[in-house]
Every structure is written in C-alpha cells, then in structure tokens.
Amino acid sequence: MSWGIAWPWNRRIVPHSSACGERRWRVESVGVAVVRKMDKREIAKILEEIGLLLELKGENPFKSNAYYNAARTIESLTDDVTELIASGRIRDLKGIGLALAEKLAELVGTGRLTYYEELKQSLPPGLLEMTAIPGMGPKKIRAVWEKLGITTMGELEYACVENRLVSLPGFGQKTQDKIRQGIRQLKRRRGFHLYANVIGEAERIVEVIRHSAEVRSAELVGELRRRLEVVQTISVLVSADRPQSVLEGLRQMGGLWELARAGDRIIGKSPLGIPVAVVVSEDMSAHVLLTATGSEEHLSELAARAARMKIPWNLTSDLGVKLAPKADSEEALYAALGLPFIEPELREGLGEIEAAETGLLKPLVEAWHIQGIFHNHTTYSDGSASLDDMVVAAKSLGYRYIGISDHSQSAFYANGLKEDRVREQHAAIDGLRKRTSGIAIFKGIEADILPDGMMDYPDEVLARFDFVIGSVHSRFNLPEEEQTARVIRALVNPYVTMLGHPTGRLLLSREGYRIDMKRVIDAAKQSDKVIEINANPHRLDLDWRLCRYAKEQGVKVSINPDAHATDGLEDVAFGVNVARKGGLEASEVVNTLGPDDILPALSAPHH
C-alpha cells in the first residue's frame, strides 16, 4: 500500500528496547553514496557559515553554537571525514547528533545542503560578506541591517562616510572608524582601489622620488594619469641615470615595503599595501611618457593611424621605443599624426581619436571653473557639520554659492526633514543669509523618488525650494523597465531640478540598479533637467562613459560633492575628473555659472 509519502533516502526504521523493556522503533541513518569527496575544511567552513547565518537571523545562541562546535570538531579530525559521514560513524563524535549527521550525509551524498542554501536565501547575501570586516560581528551586522537597512559592505562603508553609525547603540565614533578602516583593508586584498584612496599616497611617492639624488624628473603614469575611478597600481616614470639612486631614495622614505629592483624597474608596496611600479629611464622622452600613460587601446589606435599614414611608428608596451617620429613633447607626437593634443583622461580608445580628427575635442572643464556646489548635507539630516560650518567652509574654498540639500522625510534612516523641520531650516538659512556676505546660500532638498516615481513631498512643499535633487534611495531591485519609468516620471515633475547619483552604484561595493540610462538621459533632455555627477569618490555617478552620451544629447551635468562634512566639499575635484574623462567642456557643466545665472539655468518653474 502506498501512502504517497517519500521516505528519506538515507534513513531506516530499526527496533530497539526502551529502558523499561518495551519494544519500540527508532530512525537511524545508513551509509550513503559519496558524490564528491570533501575536505574537512570545506565541511567545517559550511558549518561555520551556518552558525553565522543563524546568529544573523537572531536564532537561539545554543543552536548557532552547536554548529560552531561541530565545525571545530570536524576540523580537528585526523580520519577521513567523508568516510566517517558516509558510514554513519560521524555520530560517534561528541556534539554530532542525528539531525546534524543527516545534514552532513546530504552534503556528501548530493554535493549540496538544502538547509544551508535555504538559510542563505533567507538573508541578504551581503550580510555574510560583512562578517569578514574587523569589528563587525553578527550582532553589529544585524543592528545596521535592522536599524539602517544596510545589506552590503558598500552600503556600510557609505554609511560610515555619512557618519550614520555613531548614533547606533554599541557603536560610536571609534567603532565607525575601525569598521571603515577594516573595509579598506579588505578591498586592498582584492587588488582594486578607489582613485581617491590612492592619489594622495601616489603623489607623496612621486615627491620623494623627485627629491632623490640624480633624479631629473618623475611623473605619475598609467591609470592614475588617466584618472580612472578605480586603479590597481601606482605607476611612476622617472628620468634618472641610475635606478639604484631612485631605489635608495624610496628606502629612505620609509613605509614602503617589499622593495626590489630588476634592471630599470623597481617594485614594492605603498604604506597602504598598494602595488608600486617605478620605471627608470635615462631620458623621459615624449614617446616613453605617451606609452607609459596608455591605454593599450589608445596606443593601438595611434599605431594603426600611423600605419595608414605610412609614418614610422613602433612604440612598445615595455617602453622600449623602437621607431617613432622625432618629437620633444606629446603634443608634437600627436601633431605628427595630424592630431591635436589629446588629454590623458581621454586616452581610453573610445572614439577620442576620431573626435580629435574631426575637431570635436574642445578644452575640458577644470576645477577652477566650478563656481558653486549643490548637494550638501548638514546636521539637519545626516551631516556632521552645521549649516554655518558648511557655508564657511565653502566660502573658504572660493565658491560663490552653496546649495544646502538635506534628506527628505522618507529618509527616516538619515533623519530626513518633515515639513515643520523644512520651515525651521529655511528660517535658519534666511538668518544666515543676512549675516553672511561673499557667498550665496540656496535652499534645496535631496528628495526621495518613491517607487511609483512620485516625490515624497507635495508640490506646494517642493515649490518652497530653490532647487530639488531627486534621488533613488530604496527599492534598488526593481526590474529595469520599472526602475527606468520610475526615474523618468520623477524627471517630468516640474519642481525637480536635477537627478542625484543616477545609477545608485557604490564603486567596488554595489552595482548600480538596473536602469536604462540612455532613456533617462533622453528624458532629461526632453524635460530640460540636469543630471548630477556625484563627486563622492565612492560613487562618481554619473559614470564618465555615460557623460559622453549626455554630451551628445546636450544634457548638462552638475558636479556635486554630496558632502556630509566640511572636508567632503573637496571631493568636487574627483567629479571634475569624471567630467573630463567624459569629454565635458565648462559650458556643459551647469555649476560653472555664477550665482546670478545659476537658478534660471536650472529651469525651476518659480524662477
């Protein structure tokens, strides 16, 4: 007779006697066929992760400790663990009960463990990754997840930047600083680094080399000279007769480690563990500088152009110049190919040579072109500096206006402003305007774009602001069509001035949400809206590749620091890098306008 019940494949019912002599039945595990022989460390790691996942879920500590103890037991085994599991003898070990033995049997018998996979699926995947951060145990991870909605390492790092952890119970400033430092350490181990985390150290190394004996000149080259947002190596080109003198100078600098020399090359690691590659050349010729800067794609296109023009051209990637036109500068090298000088930031092999050939390359925007800055937070929401301090800092940097834009009411995690606090802040700005000269102060808001594309204030509230930045801060996982429609609907709102951090990405940490940015840029053109280049070095969003499309469509950008402290105002320089890589001129960046011209240019309906 069949009852329609599938009995587990690795269990059987056997008779046994109870303590009082009664005949009863019990379930026992039987031997299993091994699908894949597993190392004890593999099995222990899975058990350890199950313990972590249970802690992250807030399960009974006894339950998670059982898995931790089992992991330690298995890792200490000298016998073949797979054989012990397959034979059922694993139950002889202390702490391995029937339920756990059955899970281990499933693991080696099928190559997977349903319980483990279901546990992982029940939690955001980024939570487990965060356990690798020093100082971030399961309790703290659970706290930032439940209190701040943080589910990835990138979001956690950005929350540290925004100073949002200090107010959580059990955290504080020191803990926040330690967490941020730990995240950086993890990223370094993975081999990629934010430009902003590298450039300061790289410039110090170059300065030390320049002051070394016998050195004529030294320049950053490669990814850093091209100002890529993410880099792997600090590459330096040095003009000197003896590589040994350069090596000695680096040794005297201190902090560099694993320094070694092979011929004209010196390698090592910076104090932060970033690979350093120094090439010493007797003469830093234009040919060598061009080649060391790259990119490979750009150099390849130059070589192809030279071949078509029948010009001798054979620059090698190992910096051994075999054949090239005579030139005393990079400008002269490009001129030999009938081209104007191409700025290093543009040399990515993405159409810059064709643009130069047809006269489309214009002078790029410079940091000094920026007249004022939008997207600045204060202590009214999640900033760490007061309104007064942010204005004073912006003025000291030479800006002629600053736009204050704290978070809106939906951003509860960031102390977003309800309508009464909007009125309170506006009154404070009015008072500050009266006692401040030399800088204009604009009233703004970073308003959440709700999932349906509506803004989280009614129009009568939005009308009170000088500018409105619309940003997505929730529901990142919407399908592409829905996310795109959501953002486009926000751009149609007559009170929205610009789109903030348009893809939501966090470099090296979180991919942007699925969105058709070309359609969004087209919509910005139709509604005459500005798109932000968020200059925070963790974002740099709009990406420079998309800046090129915005340029083609005639859509202007605003380079905004997204500052949450006074030092964050200085991030504008990183946004300028993005704009330059995107080929943007000063006239294509809206905040190169002065204070009298900027608000009309933002097309707000009440100006």
Residue spans of the language-model regions?
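Charged, compositionally biased N-terminal leader segments and the immediate start
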Residues: V35-E59
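Conserved HRD-motif arginine in the catalytic loop of eukaryotic-like protein kinases
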Residues: V14
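Accessory alpha-helical DNA-binding modules that contact the DNA backbone or grooves
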Residues: K37, P61-I266, G273-P275, A286-H287, ...
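Short, Lys/Arg-enriched N-terminal segments with co-localized hydrophobic residues
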Residues: W25-K37
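Core AdoMet radical
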Residues: G403-I404, I445-E446
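Charged catalytic cores and adjacent phosphate/nucleic-acid-binding surfaces used
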Residues: R36, R227-T378, S386-I402, Q409-I439, ...
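Tryptophan (W) side chains
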Residues: W3, W7-W9, W25
